[in-house]
Design a protein with these regions (language model features):
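PLP-dependent amino-acid enzyme catalytic core
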Residues: 1-488
Length: 488
């Protein structure tokens, strides 16, 4: 079983007691997909609760369907935007799910909950006596620390020292411990090394929830993110043959699982995995540092279904930083309004893009150009977080590169967006996919204790990946039984 659902009755009973004392109810996957099924009593509490409040009721806001407000919102449709063609420069329509309206301002709170909730409901994590460790390149440890705080668990957040100031400042208010590891976004091995060190020091007193290897992360995005995109496609009335592509950065491998769900429904759909050009691990077995915060690198996540990936897009981190300035600097906004002709609403929507979301958009643009898609075609991507997470980067960029002018805005719009090329975009053959898959060996078998046999199962066993989605229903049964005891 790829997700441990064995029950430890003694620890489970303690977790029930903790949740009963704190009045904590756990949402099911069904409720995260369709929050209209959330009890009225919960909805009443949410109406009086801020989106980021450290209040257990906010567990029920782990959904793509939150009302897009910061205070007291209810539920509605899926939060998404269409990226204007004046920006993409391509014929097909490109849509993006919006992560800003999750608690913590990023969808990673979903993956962390999906890892933590089954462990609580089965007793594989002791909320009373153990610390939850959240290794991350940014948003995952924020989500983990937040969910831990909601559930009254002690937490340890681990992330690279060069991540944005906003991440560290917020974590200090929520996490029990914050550990900065050496390096930047792509220094994932250093995070793993710190986990091994903590495991040796603290042993049974901690549980490490590693997003790069836990299939609960894959399951959440397959089930919740994939369902959200399907719902939007239905609302838009897109013909099946015109659902052409899904683009997401590799990161932990989680968001790519939504593409697997889409491909199960639309078998012709192409999935593009994005990464930084400055660290082209998938494209060239390469390495290096980069500035696209939140997408990791230098390894292939254990939970990445590489055999189902059709394309690799390596994105220049300078393009991402330039476009972030275009969307957020006064000169950029003026140019977009007066020269490009975007409406006030379209310009406001650009604030929904964080740096990794911009990278995802560029992968979708490369994909559209590579496959010569037309006006009837549709692609989907993800805005993991929003611009609010990176405002201090603007001052840093001003200092490094000088003030952003309208001339710079024109250069970025023309170059990084309208003339984004298909260079560093690779359509994968069978053996190129296998080459990428085999890179897992060096991280996961040699360093992290996985087996050669399971690595081969991921590639050759047709039931391996298909066994994961049905586990959502099994976890829901465990959560419902747990909640029943909490409410008894």
């Amino acid at each position: 079983m790829l997700i441990n659902l064995n029950v430890n009755p003694e620890v489970r009973a303690r977790n029930v007691k903790v949740c009963k004392e704190k009045g904590i109810i756990l949402p099911t996957f069904k409720q995260m997909v369709d929050p209209s099924t959330v009890p009225a009593s919960i909805k009443e509490k949410l109406a009086k609760t801020g989106l980021w409040d450290v209040n257990p009721v906010n567990l029920f806001r782990i959904t793509w369907k939150n009302e897009p407000v910061m205070e007291g919102g209810g539920f509605g449709g899926v939060n998404y935007i269409e990226i204007p063609r004046q920006l993409t420069g391509v014929k097909p329509r490109i849509f993006a799910l919006v992560g800003k309206y999750f608690p913590t301002g990023a969808h990673k709170v979903g993956a962390t909950y999906s890892c933590l909730a089954p462990a609580l409901a089965t007793g594989n994590f002791d909320a009373q006596n153990q610390q939850a460790v959240w290794p991350s390149t940014g948003n995952y440890c924020r989500g983990g620390a937040y969910n831990s705080a909601l559930l009254g668990c002690k937490s340890i957040a681990i992330l690279p020292a060069e991540m944005s100031k906003e991440r560290f400042e917020w974590l200090k208010t929520v996490a029990g411990e914050v550990i900065a590891t050496p390096g930047c976004e792509s220094n994932v091995k250093e995070i793993f090394d710190k986990c091994h060190e903590l495991d040796a020091e603290r042993g049974k007193h901690i549980v490490i929830f590693n997003q790069f290897e836990q299939f609960e992360n894959y399951l959440w995005h397959y089930t919740v993110t994939g369902s959200a995109i399907l719902e939007v496609l239905k609302k838009l009335g897109v013909k099946p043959e015109n659902v052409r592509g899904y683009a997401s950065s590799t990161g932990s491998g989680g968001t790519l699982a939504a593409g697997d769900h889409l491909k199960d429904v639309y078998p012709h759909l192409k999935i593009a995995a994005g990464e930084a050009k400055q660290c082209p691990t998938l494209l060239r077995n390469g390495f290096g540092g980069h500035r696209i915060e939140g997408i990791g690198d230098k390894h292939v996540p254990w939970i990445h279904n590489v055999k189902n990936t059709d394309m690799i897009c390596a994105i220049d981190d300078q393009d991402c930083m330039d476009i972030y300035r275009l969307f957020n600097e006064k000169a950029g906004i003026k140019y977009l309004k007066e020269t490009v002709g975007l409406s006030d609403k379209q310009i406001e929507d650009l604030q929904l893009f964080g740096i990794s979301g911009i990278g995802n958009m560029l992968s979708a643009i490369k994909m559209a150009k590579y496959y010569e898609m037309d006006e009837d075609d549709v692609l989907f991507t993800i805005c993991t977080d929003s611009s609010i997470m990176y405002k201090t980067r603007l001052a840093e960029l001003d200092e490094q590169q000088g003030k952003f002018s309208e001339m710079e805005a024109a250069r970025v719009h023309s170059g990084a967006l309208l003339h984004q090329s298909i260079q560093d975009a690779l359509e994968l053959t069978y053996y190129e996919r296998l080459r990428v898959h085999n890179l897992k060996y060096y991280t996961w078998v040699e360093q992290q204790g996985k087996t050669y046999e399971e690595l081969n199962r991921q590639w050759y066993d047709r039931d391996y990946w298909k066994s994961i989605p049905p586990m959502a229903a099994k976890i829901d049964e465990l959560i419902e039984a747990f909640n029943k005891e909490v409410l008894a």
